[in-house]
Regions:
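Non-catalytic amphipathic alpha-helical adaptor/oligomerization segments
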Residues: 485-599
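Intrinsically disordered, low-complexity linkers and terminal regions
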Residues: 423-426, 437, 444-447
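WD40-like beta-propeller blades
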Residues: 1-418, 441-472, 477-493, 497
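Eukaryote-biased detector of low-complexity, proline/serine/threonine-rich segments
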Residues: 418-430
C-alpha cells in the first residue's frame, strides 16, 4: 500500500518536548550542556546520526545573527503574544506578525532555520496593540484591529532592494515608512475579527468580518446599509486607501479571497441552510465592476453538518470543506459532483498541495491525515527503523504540555507552475502550534537513479522496507537501523503531482485508487497529464490476464475520455482521440482473444 514517509523538524530549544533518542524521524535543537546531563542514555548517538545527515544539533550563536538567542526570544514572544499572521514570501523566507506589532522574519535552508530577525519597529507606534489581521507586501503593510473601525496603512518610502532577496532580511526601520489611518464602516464598540485579502495586482483590498444577528445589533435610530455591511471593497492607488463599495453577505462567510486567475473576482464560502434547515455551504463569486462589488454566482453544496474549515485548490476548480461531524466534502467545479469521506479526526484545518494531487486535513489536537483529490486516504509515517504507516500522524505525543495546531501551510512559490516539466519541488509543510513551537514536516522524496529506458531523472514518492543499514558510534552500544526504502513503483520527480500519485498507485497495484484520481482530473486543462496517466493504467491492465474486474477497470479508464461527466472541448478531443483510439482497439482485441480462448 502506498504511504508517505516524513520527518518532523521542530524549531525549538525547549526541554519540554518529549522526543526520544530512537525517534530518528523527529528533531529539535539542543543546548550543548544537554549532552552532558540527559535522561536519554543514547542521545549522543542520535546526535551523530543527525549531523551525518547535515542536520544541526546545536545552533550557532555568532554575531550578528546570534541564531540561538534569537530563537529563544522568538519562543518567549510566542508564549506571551498572539501571532496574527504568518506569510511565506517565497520558499525561503517566512514573516510572522504578532498582535503587539512585532514582525519576525525567518530564513530557511531546507527544513532548518538559518536566520531569525525580530523587528520591533512598530511597537508603541500604532493606535492599538490588538491587531486582527495584516497584509504584508514589498511596498506597504495594511493592518486591521479588533476594536477599531480603522485600517492602518504603512507605506515604505524606500523600496526593498536586494540582489539576493531569499537570504537578506531587512528591518522596517531601514525602509523609511510612513503610517496613516483610514476610517471604515462596520460595528462600533464591539471586538470584531476583521480579516483582509488583496488581489494579485495589489490595487484592490477586501476587509470582511463575521455577521452578527439583528437582535444583537446595538440600538441606533437609523442603521444604514453601510453600517450593516460585513464586506468592504477598498482601492489602493498612489499610496492611499479608499473605500469603494460595501455589501452585506447573505450568509456568514467562512472564507473570502480574490481569485488567482481573475484579480477582480472575489470568491467566498458562506455557511447557509436549506429549506428544511439542513446545513449547506454557498460557494459564491462576486465581481468588482466600476468600483462596485456584487454577487454574480452562487453554488449551493449540501452538507451533513456545519462547515468549520475550507480550502480551494491552486487552480480553484475544487473546493474542500471540513465539517463538525468529521466529514470532508470535496466539490468539483468542472464535473459538478460532490465527494464525501469520513476523516479520522475533526477537520479544523485543510491544506491542498500546490500540485493539486493531495490534501492534508489537520485537527487542533495535533493530528494529521492525508487524502488524494479523489478522497482516497493515504497512510503516513515518520521515518523510523520499522515500517509502520498509519491513517493519522500524531504530533501531540511529542509535547509534555498539549499544544493546539493552529496553522499548516505548504512552503511553495506564490505562483506554482502547473507545467509537467516544472522543477519546483514542494516537500515542506509549515506547522505552527499555539504558543509554539514552529516547525516543518518534510516529505521524504529521495533522489533516485532512473533506469535507462526512462527519459527523466526524479524522485521516489513512497517507500517499502527492503533491508537495513546499521550505524553506531565507536564507543556506543546502541545501533540505529536506518531503513533502506525500495519503491515498488515508478520513479517520479518528487512533485507529488497527480501523475506521480497515479504511477505509484499502479505499482502498488491500487488500480481503483488510480482510476478514481484520473476521473477527478480535467482533460480540458490537464490534457497531457490525463493522457499520460490513462496510458499508464491501460498499459498495466492490458498486460494482465483479463478478468471481469480488470475489464471494468479498462472501461472506466477509457471512459474518462470517451464518456466524461462533462463534455470535452473540441480541441481536447482532436488532440488525443487518435492516440486513445489505439488503446481502445487494443482493449477490443484483448477482449476478442480472451473470448476465443474461453470458447
Amino acid at each position: 500500500m502506498s504511504f508517505c514517509l516524513t520527518e518532523l523538524h521542530l524549531w525549538s530549544l525547549k526541554n519540554t518536548l518529549h522526543i526520544g533518542d530512537r525517534d530518528i524521524g523527529t528533531y529539535q535543537y539542543y543546548d550543548k550542556k544537554e549532552l552532558l546531563v540527559t535522561e536519554h542514555g543514547n542521545l549522543e548517538e542520535k546526535q551523530k546520526l543527525a549531523e551525518s545527515r547535515d542536520y544541526p544539533w546545536t545552533l550557532k550563536n555568532r554575531r550578528p545573527e546570534k541564531l540561538r538567542d534569537s530563537l529563544k526570544e522568538l519562543e518567549e514572544l510566542m508564549q506571551n503574544s498572539q501571532c496574527v499572521l504568518s506569510k511565506w514570501k517565497d520558499k525561503y523566507v517566512c514573516q510572522l506578525l504578532f498582535g503587539s506589532g512585532v514582525l519576525v522574519s525567518l530564513s530557511l535552508s531546507g527544513p532548518q532555520l538559518e536566520k531569525v530577525v525580530i523587528d520591533r519597529s512598530l511597537v508603541g507606534k500604532l493606535i492599538s496593540d490588538t491587531i486582527s489581521d495584516a497584509l504584508l507586501t514589498d511596498s506597504f503593510i495594511i493592518l486591521s484591529f479588533l476594536a477599531q473601525n480603522k485600517l492602518c496603512f504603512i507605506q515604505f518610502t524606500k523600496k526593498i532592494g536586494s540582489p539576493d532577496g531569499n537570504k537578506r532580511l531587512e528591518k522596517l526601520s531601514a525602509l523609511d515608512y510612513k503610517i496613516s489611518y483610514y476610517e471604515i464602516p462596520g460595528p462600533a464598540n464591539r471586538t470584531t475579527e476583521r480579516r483582509l485579502a488583496i488581489n494579485c495586482v495589489q490595487d484592490m483590498v477586501i476587509c470582511w468580518w463575521p455577521l452578527y444577528s439583528d437582535d444583537a445589533w446595538p440600538w441606533a435610530p437609523i442603521s444604514s446599509e453601510k453600517d450593516r455591511a460585513n464586506l468592504l471593497l477598498l482601492g489602493h492607488a498612489q499610496g492611499r486607501l479608499e473605500v469603494l463599495s460595501s455589501i452585506r453577505t447573505e450568509w456568514n462567510p467562512l472564507d473570502v479571497h480574490f481569485g488567482t486567475k481573475q484579480p477582480y473576482q472575489v470568491l467566498t464560502v458562506e455557511g447557509s441552510t436549506g429549506g428544511d434547515k439542513e446545513p449547506m455551504a454557498d460557494s459564491c463569486i462576486y465581481e468588482c465592476v466600476r468600483n462596485k462589488i456584487q454577487c454574480v454566482s452562487v453554488t449551493r453544496i449540501p452538507l451533513r453538518s456545519k462547515a468549520i474549515s475550507c480550502c480551494r485548490t491552486v487552480t480553484e476548480d475544487k473546493l474542500i470543506l471540513g465539517c463538525e461531524d468529521s466529514s470532508v466534502i470535496l466539490y468539483e467545479t468542472h464535473r459538478r459532483v460532490t465527494l464525501l469521506v469520513q476523516a479520522e479526526l475533526l477537520p479544523s484545518l485543510i491544506s491542498c498541495h500546490p500540485s493539486g494531487a493531495i490534501l492534508l486535513v489537520g485537527s487542533n489536537q495535533g493530528e494529521l491525515q492525508i487524502f488524494d483529490m479523489a478522497l482516497s486516504p493515504i497512510n503516513i509515517q515518520l521515518l523510523a527503523e520499522d515500517r509502520s504507516p498509519r491513517a493519522t500522524l500524531q504530533f501531540n505525543k511529542y509535547f509534555n504540555v498539549a499544544s493546539s495546531l493552529v496553522q499548516m501551510q505548504w512552503i511553495a512559490p506564490q505562483v506554482v507552475s502547473q507545467k509537467p516539466e516544472s522543477r519546483d519541488i514542494c516537500d515542506l509543510l509549515f506547522l505552527r502550534f499555539d504558543r509554539g513551537p514552529l516547525g516543518v514536516l518534510l516529505f521524504k522524496l529521495v533522489t533516485a537513479q532512473v533506469p535507462d529506458h526512462m527519459s527523466i531523472k526524479g524522485h521516489r514518492l513512497c517507500y517499502r522496507k527492503n533491508n537495513a543499514k546499521s550505524m553506531s558510534s565507536s564507543g556506543g552500544s546502541k545501533k540505529y537501523n536506518l531503513p533502506t526504502w525500495k519503491s515498488r513503483g515508478i520513479f517520479t520527480r518528487g512533485q507529488l503531482s497527480p501523475v506521480d500519485m497515479i504511477f505509484q498507485y499502479i505499482h502498488c497495484d491500487e488500480i481503483c485508487e488510480a482510476i478514481n484520481l484520473l476521473s477527478s482530473m480535467n482533460w480540458n486543462t490537464l490534457g497531457h497529464q490525463c493522457f499520460v496517466s490513462m496510458s499508464a493504467i491501460v498499459n498495466h491492465l492490458l498486460r494482465q490476464k483479463l478478468t471481469p474486474e480488470r475489464e471494468a477497470q479498462l472501461e472506466a479508464s477509457l471512459g474518462t475520455f470517451y464518456a466524461p461527466t462533462r463534455p470535452l472541448l473540441d480541441t481536447t478531443v482532436l488532440e488525443y482521440r487518435d492516440q486513445i483510439s489505439k488503446y481502445a482497439r487494443r482493449f477490443f482485441h484483448h477482449l476478442l482473444r480472451t473470448s476465443i480462448t474461453l470458447h
